[in-house]
Amino acid sequence: MGPTASGKTALALELAEKHNCEIISVDSALIYRGMDIGSAKPSVDELARGPHRLIDIRDPRESYSAADFRADAIAEIEQIVSMGKTPVLVGGTMMYFKALLEGLSPLPSADEAIRAEIQAEADEKGWEALHDQLRDIDPVSAERIHPNDPQRLSRALEVYRISGKSMTELTQTKSAPLPYDVVQFAIAPRERKVLHDLIAQRFAIMLKQGFLEEVTELKARGDLHLDLPSMRCVGYRQCWQYLDGEFDYDTMVEKAVAATRQLAKRQLTWLRSWPELNWLESGAEGNLVTLMRQCR
């Protein structure tokens, strides 16, 4: 695990080449076909050195949830283990790691009809009245969700109307945790400025590699838009907006780099509270030796 631009892929490739391992990607951007440059997808040469599972498995117009990832990752892990190899999970989508390790609550999928029914009630009675409903059926969620947060309030009521159980009840029940021994590592530069510089350098390289042309091709399809999860990936949104004429080139670069730095900050926030985590410094000599020693 680690923030974007921290050197996860390079270390994973070194591990795969020198030991009996196979790589599974844990990245919500790498799953999409046609999104290669802006997602920092491993190059053809890198994939030849160490093939990655769970990349290029969805079209950008399709959704992919943490539950989807968990099911796919467990299937890949089982196959790798059956071959007598060790799976190495590499990426920066912390929600995927958490879902894989801890399991997920069995919340029902969205129901557009019930959601529309709730919205109609809110239009008639107001969200305060619906918050009172939630307090009656799920006081714990009502305490946590403000009446002025219609999205979360609607979802809590929707869950109850679909399942007959409160969100609090359902979130107390999770699927079984991962049935394997796991050794967890995070890699990051020691200094925040180093990471910020790496992010800016990598975005400049992406632009030279044709990132804007990649986004131009995605826009030209005609079936993609900025509300899709794929197009909300950092860099893609800013390039799309630049191509739409919303701001100039320098502003696009500034916004994309800033968004990527914010992503890295969120990733590090997750990692600092992550239990049983072994830390490695980006670019440090002996990282592979340290990693293998901890795995014994």
UniProtKB/Swiss-Prot annotation:
Catalysis: reaction(s): adenosine(37) in tRNA + dimethylallyl diphosphate = N(6)-dimethylallyladenosine(37) in tRNA + diphosphate
Record bears the keyword Transcription: no
Positions that bind substrate: 4-9
Class in the EC hierarchy, top level: transferase
NCBIfam families (alphabetical): miaA
The protein's role, per its UniProt record: Catalyzes the transfer of a dimethylallyl group onto the adenine at position 37 in tRNAs that read codons beginning with uridine, leading to the formation of N6-(dimethylallyl)adenosine (i(6)A).
Name assigned to this protein: tRNA dimethylallyltransferase
Organism for this UniProt entry: Shewanella baltica (strain OS155 / ATCC BAA-1091)
Gene name tied to this protein: miaA
